[in-house]
Structures are given as C-alpha cells and as structure tokens.
C-alpha cells in the first residue's frame, strides 16, 4: 500500500490540507436521526471505543461491540468493559455482516489487521468509520468502493468525551468523508449523525478532511502537546535541582505547574496566561519565548516536513514491524529520568506561585503553541484546525502529567503520539541545553522582583501577544463554544 497523501498531485494535497469549515448549529437540526434504526458496530473497546459507544447509545442508537474471538474467550479488559456496561458483544463473524456502520476504534497499529478482517464481512453499501485517519492517509489502506468511509474525531481523550456529554455538552470535533469512498453521497449525513450522537455538535464541529486531520494531529501531538511538555519537564527539573532546589519541590512545581498554567490558557488563551504575571515577569517571559522560538523553529519545521512527506510514518511503521523496539526503549529510559523518580513534595504550592516561579515554563508554552500553530498554517493547514491541534488540547495533556507525571501522559496518549513525542523530546532537550545554561535568576524557581517597567515596551509586548493569529482565531472559537454551551445547558 502507498501513502495516500503522496499519491495526490500538489493541487489535491493543498485542497485537502486546507479543508476546514466551522459548521453551524442548524446543520445538526436532525441530530443523530440518520443513524437511528441502523446497526452500529464498534470494533475496539478502549477509551474512545467505550465512551463514544456510551454516548451514542444514550443518543438512541443501536450499539454493539465486535471483538476478536480470543478477547471474548479470555474475557479480556475490552470484553469486560463492554459487557459490564450492558452492551451486546460478539465476534467479527457474528456482528459485522449485519452492520450498517462499522466504527474502527482500535489503536493505529492494529487498523490494517482489523480492516483486513472486517472488510470481507461487511455487507454491500455499508459504512466504515474512523476517529483518526492514519490508516487511510499514511498507511494508504484501500477500502472496497461500495463502502462509505467517514471520520468523526473528538479533540479530547475518550473520558472527556463521556464527561462532557453527561454534563449536557460535548467536545469540539472534526468530521470528514474520504473522497475516494462516498459511492452514495451519504458520507456527510453519516458523519454528522455520528458526531451528534457523541454530543460533539454542542461544542462545535469542523468539516475537515482525512488529510488535514492526520497531518495537523501528528504535528500537534509531537511538538507542543506532548514533546514540548516532556522536554520542558526534564529540562526544568534538572535546572532547578542543579541550582539547589529541593528535588521534591522542583518535581511538584513542574508536575502541577503545566496544568495550572494551561488552565489560564484554556480560559483566555496566551493573553490571559501572560496576564497572570507581573509586568516585569511578563516582559521577561515574552523575551524568553522569542528566544525559544528562534532556537526551536527548525526543529518544528523538520517535524512538519517529515509528517507531510510521510517520513515520520514510514519510520514509525518500521518500528511497529520491529516489535516497537525504539518505542519501548524510549519509554523505559523516560521512566528512569530524575524527574520521574523524584520524591513527592508534601507541602502546598499556591496557584499564583506556579506562575510567579514558572516564568520559563510559561515562555515554553507560549513559544511551543505559537510555533506549532505557525508551522501548521505555513504548511497549508487552516487556522481553526491548527488551533484545535495546539492550544485547545494542551490543558488536557497537562492534566495527565498532573496525575502521574510523564508516565501517565504516555499511557493515555496513543502509541503514535508517544512515538512522535520521544522523537521530538530527544532532539529538543540537547538543543535547549545551551539556552538553559544562560538563564537569569527569576526565570525559574524564584519570582522576578517587582520593579519599574518601560510603558512603551509593555504596550508593544501586550499588543504583540494579543494580535497573534492564534489569539484571534482562539477568541472566536472559544466564543462559539461558550455560546453553544449556554444554548445546550438552556435546553
């Protein structure tokens, strides 16, 4: 199989990379009705599989789970989760032939085997659904021409998909139809109904393409969402300890600092995050972020280039074929780092303390978010897609570190994201070591003293922060979410 993106000509590549439209609430007036009375069979019962299934069932759809024979016979975790939640469970042979929509929610590396198993069993004219387009775009999976291929990609972990639905809301979602597989022209109707059934239409849906979703998703998770947080955690911890900070305090400042800092990001973008700092600290954070952007820009561009060309995917798939040797080695090495093995700090750190003593961390967040966004947009990805794959998801990933450090982040994210994270962080840590050696007192671990600032400089920095394109599109999209939540909660 050939990488699908690389089979397209340049005009087709640009058209698919640039496909992104924020859909109006009125486009979902029919809710999930297009799929009501039809049989939806989900393959895989992990975080996305279970939680999407729960939402879809609560939205009135007929949901069952197709699992491998051995998973059922051995009563594995997937079987237990599905049966304990009252779902019908059967083998591929028992359930797939009757399915109107088969939703493949297994890990990326299993997709080819799953499709190879289910495709011969699918009835003529059925639909195949994904929540990530890697198998179609990067692997180049060929699907029977009578089958409609759609994607519904919630921009959150599966647990959040469920919790937001239970609150009467949803999570922002990308939907797409594979242009090579829409024989009856019903792909968009299926995708809209599926998105509505998960609650995504209440938070905002972007009509996208398989290509745009995959390329932007890979870029976000490799750089700012996971790679930058891992590299930043390791670098900042080592710097604090090197300067005499108690390792337990240093660990807590970083572990919970990312979550605290990005909560401000979630509520009001980079502008609010920077506004949490004193004026002298804001000026310093801005200066540090500009230095970081200059240093890291080539690394971000290399990751984007390798994602666009397919170099990243081919390297990762070679590691799949080698029993994940690189992935497992990197995972083990990360678990042995000083940050991961540091003792826990029993004392309390106040919320503002995380900002005051984390100026460098704030600079890293700002630089990483802006660089990821800029690099995606420069590559033809539309701003709304770039926002969701950079700033929007960052607080969710930071929350995983707050639970159990980098271990938890790497457990929760996909193997694809984890592999890309290690590629980035292993390059970024040595790249930034000279920069770390030049830090000033107050950049990390100590607060910058209050003092006079130049009004004109502060004015210009504030303007630069607020006028960045990600702040403009972020304000618009957060406004949509707030408005939609208000409408949804009001009934």
From Swiss-Prot:
Pfam families: KARI_C, KARI_N. It is an enzyme of class 1 (oxidoreductase). Substrate binds at residue 414. Signal peptide: none annotated. It catalyses: (2R)-2,3-dihydroxy-3-methylbutanoate + NADP(+) = (2S)-2-acetolactate + NADPH + H(+); (2R,3R)-2,3-dihydroxy-3-methylpentanoate + NADP(+) = (S)-2-ethyl-2-hydroxy-3-oxobutanoate + NADPH + H(+). NADP(+) binds at residues 45-48, 68, 76, 78, 108-110, 158. It comes from the Bacteria. GO terms for cellular component: cytosol. Binds 2 magnesium ions per subunit. The keyword Metal-binding applies. Its cofactor is Mg(2+). Involved in the biosynthesis of branched-chain amino acids (BCAA). Catalyzes an alkyl-migration followed by a ketol-acid reduction of (S)-2-acetolactate (S2AL) to yield (R)-2,3-dihydroxy-isovalerate. In the isomerase reaction, S2AL is rearranged via a Mg-dependent methyl migration to produce 3-hydroxy-3-methyl-2-ketobutyrate (HMKB). In the reductase reaction, this 2-ketoacid undergoes a metal-dependent reduction by NADPH to yield (R)-2,3-dihydroxy-isovalerate. Belongs to the ketol-acid reductoisomerase family. This is Ketol-acid reductoisomerase (NADP(+)). It comes from Escherichia coli O1:K1 / APEC. The gene is ilvC.
């Amino acid at each position: 199989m050939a990488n699908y993106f690389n089979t397209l000509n340049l005009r087709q590549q640009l058209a698919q990379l640039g496909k992104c439209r924020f859909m109006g609430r009125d486009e979902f007036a029919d809710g999930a009705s297009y799929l009501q009375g039809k049989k939806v069979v989900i393959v895989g019962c992990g975080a996305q599989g279970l939680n999407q299934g729960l939402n879809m069932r609560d939205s009135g759809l007929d949901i069952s789970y197709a699992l491998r024979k051995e998973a059922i016979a051995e009563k594995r975790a997937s079987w237990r989760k599905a049966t304990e939640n009252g779902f019908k469970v059967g083998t591929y042979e028992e359930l797939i032939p009757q399915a109107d929509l088969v939703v493949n929610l297994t890990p990326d590396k299993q997709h080819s085997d799953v499709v190879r198993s289910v495709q011969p069993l699918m009835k003529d004219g059925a639909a195949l659904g994904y929540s990530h387009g890697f198998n179609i775009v990067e692997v180049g999976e060929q699907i029977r021409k009578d089958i409609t291929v759609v994607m519904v990609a919630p921009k959150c972990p599966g647990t959040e998909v469920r919790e937001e639905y239970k609150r009467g809301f949803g999570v922002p979602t990308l939907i797409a139809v594979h242009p090579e597989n829409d024989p009856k022209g019903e792909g968009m109707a299926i995708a809209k109904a599926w998105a509505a059934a998960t609650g995504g239409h209440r938070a905002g849906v972007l009509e996208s393409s398989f290509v745009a979703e995959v390329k932007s998703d890979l870029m976000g998770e490799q750089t700012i969402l996971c790679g930058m947080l891992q590299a930043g955690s390791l670098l900042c911890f080592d710097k604090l300890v090197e300067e005499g900070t108690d390792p337990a305090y240093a660990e807590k400042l970083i572990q919970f600092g990312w979550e605290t800092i990005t909560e401000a990001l979630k509520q009001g973008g980079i502008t609010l995050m920077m506004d949490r700092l004193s004026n002298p600290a804001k000026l310093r954070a801005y200066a540090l972020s500009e230095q970081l952007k200059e240093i890291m820009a080539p690394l971000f561009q290399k990751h984007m280039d390798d994602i666009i060309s397919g170099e990243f995917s081919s390297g990762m798939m070679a590691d799949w074929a080698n029993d994940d040797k690189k992935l497992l080695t990197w995972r083990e090495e990360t678990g042995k780092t000083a940050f991961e093995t540091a003792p826990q700090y029993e004392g309390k750190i106040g919320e503002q303390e995380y900002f005051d003593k984390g100026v460098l961390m704030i600079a890293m967040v700002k630089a990483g978010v802006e660089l990821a966004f800029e690099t995606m947009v420069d590559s033809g990805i539309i701003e709304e897609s770039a926002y969701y794959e950079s700033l929007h998801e960052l607080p969710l990933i930071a929350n995983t570190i707050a639970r159990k450090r980098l271990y938890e982040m790497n457990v929760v994210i996909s193997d694809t994201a984890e592999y890309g994270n290690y590629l980035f962080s292993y390059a970024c840590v040595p790249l930034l070591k000279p920069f770390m050696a030049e830090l000033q007192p107050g950049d990390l671990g100590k607060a910058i003293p209050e003092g006079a600032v130049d009004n004109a400089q502060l004015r210009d920095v504030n303007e630069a922060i607020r006028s960045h394109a990600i702040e403009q599109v972020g304000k618009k999209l957060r406004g949509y979410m707030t408005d939609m939540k208000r409408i949804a909660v009001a009934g």
